[in-house]
């Protein structure tokens, strides 16, 4: 997938789910399910409930996303 097709949104983690999945509430009040990106997993960046994050989504499935950044 090329970078032009990716949609980026900010949101807040509301719930931790099994298998390293997270329920995220986006700034536009949509709720999605997201997983951490491979680079975040590799660098052991922890994501907890209440963290403000950046999520990448594909325009084809707007219910799932990938967490790419955790704000400090």
From Swiss-Prot:
Alphabetical list of PROSITE patterns matching this protein: S1_IF1_TYPE
Domain of life: Bacteria
GO MF entry, a single one: ribosome binding
Pfam families per the UniProt record, alphabetical: eIF-1a (PF01176)
Cellular component GO terms, alphabetical: cytosol
Presence of the UniProt keyword Ribosomal protein in the record: no
Keyword Iron: no
Subcellular location: Cytoplasm
Keywords: Cytoplasm, Initiation factor, Protein biosynthesis, RNA-binding, rRNA-binding
Domain S1-like: 1-72
HAMAP family: IF_1
Function: One of the essential components for the initiation of protein synthesis. Stabilizes the binding of IF-2 and IF-3 on the 30S subunit to which N-formylmethionyl-tRNA(fMet) subsequently binds. Helps modulate mRNA selection, yielding the 30S pre-initiation complex (PIC). Upon addition of the 50S ribosomal subunit IF-1, IF-2 and IF-3 are released leaving the mature 70S translation initiation complex.
UniProt subunit comment: Component of the 30S ribosomal translation pre-initiation complex which assembles on the 30S ribosome in the order IF-2 and IF-3, IF-1 and N-formylmethionyl-tRNA(fMet); mRNA recruitment can occur at any time during PIC assembly.
Family: Belongs to the IF-1 family.
Descriptive protein name: Translation initiation factor IF-1
Lineage: Bacteria, Pseudomonadati, Pseudomonadota, Alphaproteobacteria, Hyphomicrobiales
């Amino acid at each position: 997938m090329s970078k032009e097709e990716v949609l980026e949104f900010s949101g807040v983690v509301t719930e931790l789910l099994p298998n390293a999945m997270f329920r995220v509430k986006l700034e536009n009040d949509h709720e999605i399910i997201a997983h951490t990106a491979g680079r975040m997993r590799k660098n052991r960046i922890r994501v907890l409930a209440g963290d403000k994050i950046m999520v990448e989504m594909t325009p084809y499935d707007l219910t799932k996303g990938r967490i790419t950044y955790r704000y400090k």
